[in-house]
Amino acid sequence: MEIRTIGIIGQGALGVMYGNYLKKRMGNENVFFIADEGRVNRYRSADMVCNGEACGFSYRSPAEAVTADLIIFAVKFMGMESALETVKPFVGEHTLFLSVLNGISSEEMIEKAYGADHVLYACVQGMDAGKDGNEVTYKNMGYITIGNKDRSHDEKLKAVTELFDRTGLAYKVP
């Protein structure tokens, strides 16, 4: 499986940092932010800025859903339940999930909602992104430690590591 489309839910520092990075390498048509209709309207009216550059992100509400190959959760933990519901129309038979919320609770919630076969575990380290209003700044993106709960190497891990290799996103597999 090759990951060609990425949906990101959560427009905090990590969501914007990874979204901007991936959008520049894969194109705005292939990387989009997922949000409820109210947030989409708000996001479209005030463009995000990342390290001084306007992002020009693409946004999709559930009414505008397309199947994503990978969905990245970058919401605060208290927003996970709502996010799990919001992404539902974007989920297909082969959609993979990655959460950049450190700790394993979010992955367990995704597994419960969509099945363990679709979830990779991740921990972001070494980044220094911060957000103030609609501006995100960072000097160091750090890296993502990624893998399966049982430390196996399977097709879903291969698909995501190939994506990271293709885009140059720093990662480690334990």
Can you describe what each PLM-predicted range is?
Residues 52-135:
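Rossmann-like NAD(P)(H) cofactor-binding subdomain of soluble oxidoreductases
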Residues 9, 13, 87, 156:
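Flavin (primarily FAD) cofactor-binding/catalytic cores of flavoenzymes
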Residues 90, 116-118, 133-174:
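Internal alpha-helical scaffold of NAD(P)-dependent oxidoreductase catalytic cores
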Residues 39-42, 107-108, 153-154:
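Short, charged/polar "capping" segments at the starts of alpha-helices
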Residues 7, 31-32, 98, 145, ...:
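A structural signal for isolated positions on well-ordered beta-strands in alpha/beta enzyme cores
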